[in-house]
Amino acid sequence: DDGRFRAFVNACRHRGVAVEEEERGTKRRFVCPFHSWAYDPQGALVGLPKADHFGEIDKECFGLIELPAEEKYGLLFANPNPSGTVDVDRLLGEDLSKEFEAWNFGAYGRLGGDRYEVDCNWKLAMDTFGETYHFTSLHKDSLANFFEGNVQCYDTYGQHHRMILCKKAIQEMREWPEDRWEITLAGLPVYWIFPNSIVMPSDFGLYVVRAYPDEENPGRHTSVISFYARGESLGTAESNTITTERQALLQTAPLEVLAEVAQGFAAIIRDEDYVASASQQRSAESGAFDHVIFGRNEPALHHYHNTYRAALGMGSLPLLDPTSMN
């Protein structure tokens, strides 16, 4: 193995049965459960029972179908179209590529993850990560204890964007010398990678959320959430209370504890955000009204949907004329 990231169509070249059902792990051989055709980690066909029944089969012609793939900035990118391409720097653009490189995601270690089947369209799931206006209402007993609601810094990067949520700890940090400032102690950066991925570096790790449409039902989707631990410390012992507490957490807490913290954050998404999203879906399906309203304090929502529309060859969302409201 040369250590290079590769991606393949998960289908045996014999009769198309999925070769691997596990989401993650390590194997020297991947064996199809149907007829035991075997492949190595590079996707090459290395064995098949009764090979003589297939004549002079050239194994080099029957490896797993490889997909365009690239590992960059600690993240894995793959194109599901075998004839497509992957150019991460072109996808992200120069400015966002520099930011992702600076995060050093490759040094983070995986804590775990979860998968949710949700009764809402995948775009409604993305919307929940696009504003903090709802924090003091929907999250009044959870995230509102740590974040300022309806406050964010927002920037676009072509099709993508970055929103930084404001933590209440920023009130203490503003009194510190600038050389002790740490962005993830004062805020939570939320990157949206068009069209369906959220990347959130936190003070002790990283959350990645991907929303996949249900091909049979546009009113459902699957959210896959992954958690990662951040290894480096966040300051010096003589710096400040919050930084020192976080250092202690990183240096002494078992990974199981960090995983529980991450799982708790994911549960808020599942039990609060996605419950609201499912309610929105029911309203949309009722036919009672044909549009919703995005406020000026919700710029990410404007960008989400205008970017979707542009990709579909549609015009931008219309601006609301307040004088025409009933």
List the predicted regions and their residue ranges.
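Rieske [2Fe-2S] iron-sulfur-binding domain
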Residues: 1-94
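C-terminal catalytic domain of Rieske-type non-heme iron oxygenases
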Residues: 10, 70, 75-326
